[in-house]
């Protein structure tokens, strides 16, 4: 068992660390404070081949593996979790299901748009009355001739008001429960598509989150993703992969907070010496480091398993659960080390703590992750 990254993965980490330091970190505070979508940096990430990087080269992607994508999200999130979130959603929740379940015609049309075409992707599953219980969605798609007519709405959609391509889940047969859910590829230009409420959130201010509304929206029949009635399975499989992205995001937040706290405590002198020299902060740092290392191993393991094409549902849930809860603990403890300064916007700690919280909620709450893990333990 080799725990060393390949040369390719090392180069990807180096590239993303440099990009994050030079392009992402300098605008992270302003992105949060002014609720700005980091458009220029996302365009640069398209140019670097990070957006849609796991898409095969014949469709415009880099042909990278899931571990490479996780490393990119991790590095970006050390400075700006919003940027990491945008990439994670695009790569894991839009490109991936189209690549995995799309027809050759769908892949040939949409994957180049999501790579070299600089079109942003999104994933529409959650509804006002269907959060953790995704089977209770009310959005409907009725077949009329050569197209479907879709009505309903989705909420909390990451990339919502900037995305061009959406993977949407709707009921095609309400009498069949989860077996009546189908998946569709939807474009923001389709008649009847509109963006509703822009969410005002506690954190991730640079990640555009919105309600998406479908009013008699026309969806061509050929835009059904996978077979009719298989949408729920597609959603669950996609979320497995998406959880690796959120684990990487949360890991990056924790690592970034740890580094900020280390640097601050080395320079902050109290009672005649840097506070990093006191035993209590050192014990806290040890716990932070331990948690980050464990989270990294869990996340990379899940990513490698996905790349090998074997089942990784439990491993993805474990990585997401551990990293998200560790990010919340680490940012809270790191902020405490800054004292009163940590509570101000002069330092990034309060932003990191606000950003960390959502990782315990979206892509399946911590409670849902525990359900998934226990369900895959043969109990």
Q: Residue spans of the language-model regions?
A:
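Conserved hydrophobic/aromatic beta-strand scaffold that supports enzyme active sites
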Residues: 122, 138-140, 165-169, 183-185, ...
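Short Gly/Pro-enriched turn/cap motifs at secondary-structure boundaries
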Residues: 114, 129-132, 156-159, 173-175, ...
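Flexible, small-/acidic-enriched active-site or ligand-binding loops
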Residues: 136, 189-220
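Alpha-helical interface subdomain recognition
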Residues: 1-89, 101-106, 113-118, 131-134, ...
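A short core secondary-structure module
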Residues: 146-147, 151-195
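Flexible, glycine-rich active-site loops centered on histidine and acidic residues
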Residues: 95-101, 123, 135
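Short Ser/Thr-interspersed hydrophobic loop/turn segments at strand-loop and sheet-helix junctions
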Residues: 49, 73-77, 170, 186-191, ...
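A short, Trp-centered hydrophobic/proline-enriched beta-strand micro-motif
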Residues: 117-125
